[in-house]
């Protein structure tokens, strides 16, 4: 039977075209340490030029979750790849690691070359923001597993850090200052609840602007996750950072304690930073309690850094010079967990 594979739902020619289209985007991410080109069985990266006493490789892998469903609904696929990169590289930079390279995995029901190109275009943009090379990936066409409009997206990154410079959080003490770096919005966590609250129960339209939002709801929800790699690496060159937390699923409540010793807690000052209107809209439409919001979403802070009190103002200044919005949002205390002081945040 001629074209048997195509009749089974797998279009090899479309796959070849997708690879051809993505090459120009991938090329923009290359670093001098990358060996070989796109299309090999494995990606290669030369570590011989890194002048580190005890080099340690740090790896991370993650996906975008159900934020993908918003991309399907809006038929917008050119930024979702930034989210995939951000979720991985932000996780390893909190340990002091410089991301070196990234690999992606795209699984789809139907390989549409233009859509695949847009996804990889976003991945490449994320890699450029993080300074890492896109050295490989897999695009799997799986008819019957996914509908023709659906795909899943995941990524994997590897970074490097000198062993003595790994940021562990183990030396954090009571009295250290917590500095928050602003998020771009919801980032890539909590979208199952977002869809239920705003789209299913609230029946809001992706095309309309609600409340204090400055963009249509769909554009607001698809804002890419902020990548903090370059400002954090710059910070690590100049100041001692005792701990860092990437605020992802579990919000403040789960993620800040991940960087703290067992006997140390965090005291957060509500009102010390601006919380974006999208979170107010979510709480209002979903009638969600404030504590639940902080247990699910980043609430306007995508990264938290712990430093000495005497360095805090200078650290904020450096981060602002790097283009970040940074605020002192609290401090570490004797105890455990995360507590909140001040008035209502939303």
From Swiss-Prot:
Biological process terms from the Gene Ontology for this record are: 'de novo' IMP biosynthetic process; adenine biosynthetic process
Q: Which UniProt keywords apply?
A: ATP-binding, Cytoplasm, Ligase, Nucleotide-binding, Purine biosynthesis
Q: Where in the cell is it found?
A: Cytoplasm
| Class in the EC hierarchy, top level | ligase
Task: List the EC numbers from the record.
Answer: 6.3.3.1
Single GO molecular function: phosphoribosylamine-glycine ligase activity
The answer on whether this UniProt entry bears the keyword Transcription regulation reads no
Gene3D superfamilies in UniProt:
PurM-like C-terminal domain, PurM-like, N-terminal domain
Q: Which GO terms describe its cellular component?
A: cytosol
Pathway membership of this protein?
A: Purine metabolism; IMP biosynthesis via de novo pathway; 5-amino-1-(5-phospho-D-ribosyl)imidazole from N(2)-formyl-N(1)-(5-phospho-D-ribosyl)glycinamide: step 2/2
Please give the InterPro entries that the UniProt record associates with this protein. PurM-like_C_dom, PurM-like_C_sf, PurM-like_N, PurM-like_N_sf, PurM_cligase
Catalytic activities: 2-formamido-N(1)-(5-O-phospho-beta-D-ribosyl)acetamidine + ATP = 5-amino-1-(5-phospho-beta-D-ribosyl)imidazole + ADP + phosphate + H(+)
Task: Say which family it is in.
Answer: Belongs to the AIR synthase family.
Instruction: Show the PANTHER family listed in the entry.
Output: TRIFUNCTIONAL PURINE BIOSYNTHETIC PROTEIN ADENOSINE-3 (PTHR10520:SF12), TRIFUNCTIONAL PURINE BIOSYNTHETIC PROTEIN ADENOSINE-3-RELATED (PTHR10520)
Q: What is this protein called?
A: Phosphoribosylformylglycinamidine cyclo-ligase
By which gene is this protein encoded? purM
């Amino acid at each position: 039977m001629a074209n048997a594979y195509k009749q089974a739902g797998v279009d090899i020619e479309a796959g070849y075209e997708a690879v051809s289209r993505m090459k120009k985007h991938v090329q923009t991410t290359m670093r001098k340490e990358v060996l070989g080109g796109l299309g090999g069985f494995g990606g290669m990266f030369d570590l011989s030029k890194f002048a580190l006493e005890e080099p340690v490789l740090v790896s991370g892998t993650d996906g975008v979750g159900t934020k993908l469903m918003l991309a399907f609904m809006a038929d917008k696929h050119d930024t979702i790849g930034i989210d995939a990169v951000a979720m991985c590289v932000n996780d390893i930079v909190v340990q002091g690691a410089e991301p070196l390279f990234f690999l992606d995995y795209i699984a789809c029901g139907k390989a549409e070359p233009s859509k695949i190109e847009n996804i990889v275009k976003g991945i490449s943009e994320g890699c450029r923001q993080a300074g890492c090379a896109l050295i490989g990936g897999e695009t799997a066409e799986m008819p019957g597993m996914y509908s023709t409009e659906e795909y899943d997206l995941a990524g994997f990154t590897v970074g490097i850090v000198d062993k003595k410079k790994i940021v562990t959080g183990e030396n954090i003490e009571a009295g250290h200052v917590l500095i928050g770096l602003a998020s771009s919005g919801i980032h890539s966590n909590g979208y199952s609840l977002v869809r239920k609250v705003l789209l299913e129960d609230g029946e809001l339209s992706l095309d309309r602007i609600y409340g204090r939002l400055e963009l249509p709801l769909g554009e607001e929800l698809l804002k890419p996750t902020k990548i903090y790699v370059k400002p954090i690496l710059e910070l690590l060159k100049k100041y001692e950072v005792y701990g860092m937390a990437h605020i992802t699923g579990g919000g403040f409540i789960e993620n800040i304690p991940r960087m703290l010793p067992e006997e140390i807690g965090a005291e957060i000052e509500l009102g010390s930073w601006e919380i974006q209107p999208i979170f107010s809209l979510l709480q209002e439409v979903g009638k969600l309690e404030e504590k639940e919001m902080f247990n699910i979403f980043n609430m306007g802070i995508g990264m938290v850094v712990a430093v000495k009190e005497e360095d805090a103002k200078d650290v904020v200044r450096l981060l602002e010079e790097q283009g970040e919005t940074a605020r002192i949002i609290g401090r570490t205390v004797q105890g455990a967990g995360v507590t909140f002081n001040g008035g209502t945040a939303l």
